[in-house]
């Protein structure tokens, strides 16, 4: 069938309208004043729309998605521990989210995570992701950005499957938080600004905590239990901090991270990580020297000798020990908060505790 809409045209527009009206079996008109011209929108039998300007025979066919999704499909094939999916399953033992909603939330969180990885690798100028070439080195920077943006839209499309009345609001709030946190991280790197530990933690609460909060808030909105209102924000905040600080630490000392991303890759990208903040918390000659290295670093890998020098200063100056000490404190705080949640929900959650303990350093 034909559906007619209106666009502004010349003085003969009304005759076009009348002709369209008389020749169209089903017509929907949106009047915008005198002087208008018809554009026909055809809906075929399977519901897809094709545009035929001014009733012309040519139609705009739906484009293939092969190119736009190629970088996304590639990064999905890379090895993953699927921690976020397991985290959702563990929380579900408390929140009893309907199966369809749980599947949608996993899909939404997964798409947002993969999209952020593609963009992070571009912003960090990374060449390796989980031991494989990053998406933008294979498909090009522009195509990878476009694919990541498309995936964000797909995630919002999947959001419409949820029943929670506040789902869209929650989605927008936490994505704004995530991008604001990422902006701080990029700003500090660009200007070689060394933030305080409190500033750093605030950034992490937005950048890393945002996706965890989104996950929990969406699940609470879909929960079929009377416990959906229980406040888990402190638990999620601590978990987000642990994830990010653990990543900072492992990037410098883990052989697995070296194999997957390269030796001390955070130094290559100029990232202002927590160990680096601890290392530069002063103004002795060594700290001034390291700041100078960071300020004059150019795009690309930092020389291996410089990375080894900075890593040694982190060890000898106590920065790595301070980082691992904070991680141990966070582990204790997270387990304590887990016990509080178990009391609030009225049941234990051994699956969630197992997920957490697998992350411990």
Curated annotation (Swiss-Prot):
Write down the Pfam families for this protein, in alphabetical order: polyprenyl_synt (PF00348)
Query: Is Magnesium set as a keyword in this record?
Result: yes
Which residues bind Mg(2+) 1 per the record?
Answer: 120, 124
- Record-listed E.C. numbers: 2.5.1.-, 2.5.1.1, 2.5.1.29, 2.5.1.10
Q: Where does isopentenyl diphosphate bind?
A: 81, 84, 113, 130
Binding residue positions for Mg(2+) 3: 247
Look up keyword Zinc and say if it applies: no
Q: Quote the cofactor binding remark.
A: Binds 3 Mg(2+) ions per subunit.
Which residues does the record give as dimethylallyl diphosphate binding sites? Answer: 129, 207-208, 244, 251, 261, 271
List the Gene Ontology MF annotations in alphabetical order: (2E,6E)-farnesyl diphosphate synthase activity; dimethylallyltranstransferase activity; geranylgeranyl diphosphate synthase activity; metal ion binding
> Where does this protein have coiled-coil stretches?
none
Q: For this protein, what reaction is catalysed?
A: isopentenyl diphosphate + dimethylallyl diphosphate = (2E)-geranyl diphosphate + diphosphate; isopentenyl diphosphate + (2E)-geranyl diphosphate = (2E,6E)-farnesyl diphosphate + diphosphate; isopentenyl diphosphate + (2E,6E)-farnesyl diphosphate = (2E,6E,10E)-geranylgeranyl diphosphate + diphosphate
Q: Which cofactors does the annotated protein need, by name?
A: Mg(2+)
Binding residues annotated for Mg(2+) 2, in chain numbering: 120, 124
UniProt keywords (A-Z) are: Magnesium, Metal-binding, Transferase
Entries under InterPro entries matching the protein: Isoprenoid_synthase_dom_sf, Polyprenyl_synt, Polyprenyl_synt_CS
Name a biological process GO annotation: alcohol biosynthetic process
UniProt-listed CDD domains: Trans_IPPS_HT (cd00685)
Region (Disordered) residue ranges read 44-63
**Could you say which protein family the record assigns here?**
Belongs to the FPP/GGPP synthase family.
Q: What function does the entry list?
A: Geranylgeranyl pyrophosphate synthase; part of the gene cluster 25 that mediates the biosynthesis of an isoprenoid secondary metabolite.
Q: What protein am I looking at?
A: Geranylgeranyl pyrophosphate synthase 3
Naturally occurring in which organism (per UniProt)? Zymoseptoria tritici (strain CBS 115943 / IPO323)
Gene field: GGS3
